[in-house]
UniProtKB/Swiss-Prot annotation:
Gene symbol of the encoding locus: rpsO
NCBIfam families the record matches: S15_bact
Subunit structure: Part of the 30S ribosomal subunit. Forms a bridge to the 50S subunit in the 70S ribosome, contacting the 23S rRNA.
Keywords from the UniProt entry: Ribonucleoprotein, Ribosomal protein, RNA-binding, rRNA-binding
Record-level GO BP terms: translation
Cystine residue pairs: none
Organismal lineage: Bacteria, Bacillati, Bacillota, Bacilli, Lactobacillales
Keyword Ribosomal protein: yes
Organism (species): Streptococcus uberis (strain ATCC BAA-854 / 0140J)
Pfam families given in the database record: Ribosomal_S15
Function comment: One of the primary rRNA binding proteins, it binds directly to 16S rRNA where it helps nucleate assembly of the platform of the 30S subunit by binding and bridging several RNA helices of the 16S rRNA.
Top-rank taxon, per record: Bacteria
Family per record: Belongs to the universal ribosomal protein uS15 family.
SMART domains found in the cross-reference section: Ribosomal_S15
One cellular component (GO) term of this entry: cytosolic small ribosomal subunit
Official protein name in the record: Small ribosomal subunit protein uS15
Amino acid sequence: MAISKEKKNEIIAQYARHEGDTGSVEVQVAVLTWEINHLNGHIKEHKKDHATYRGLMKKIGHRRNLLAYLRRTDVNRYRELIQSLGLRR
């Protein structure tokens, strides 16, 4: 199931850097993290769903690239985002 508009708007409101911000790295990573967590639950239940697994891997790669970009450009924002999302324990 795709992310609902309400949930996506809630995530955007929480991680936006300013009013109307939908494309900042923080927002993109937060939305991808929600989608990845959602797909992980699906994969645990449907182990042979290889198409979904491939989509999950693409989303993980996209998030990894965005996080690498953020780490290169602004380490403080990167650390705050990682901590708030609960990544890299």
